């Protein structure tokens, strides 16, 4: 809702969807501590943010307790701080699961690299229209690749 000062992007919805998936598949809401798998009881979701100095991963804490608008506002604020080089270390630590989006630069597929010590990361590619033909007509169907890297 831009009138309320919040631009809602697909990332906010993907964060919420990831929380729902992590609740259903808690094995992926974990991190590695040496040889031990540590299961998390909270949902801190990181997202890759491109900065002039490279990628950083700010973390939306307790994403399960926030709505889409609140997540949209927070990801926007964290991304702005990242671009300005003003993120604090605690704003980039403690994630359980991360999202890496390549859509902004036009990629339709890639393999995201896990943000250690997390055990999984979701890639968000750019959507596109795929031509599909049947015996009667040609149509274009929306496609979106969501690669998931697991450890």
Locate each region found by the language model.
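C-terminal catalytic/motor cores of large multi-domain enzyme assemblies
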Residues: 1-151
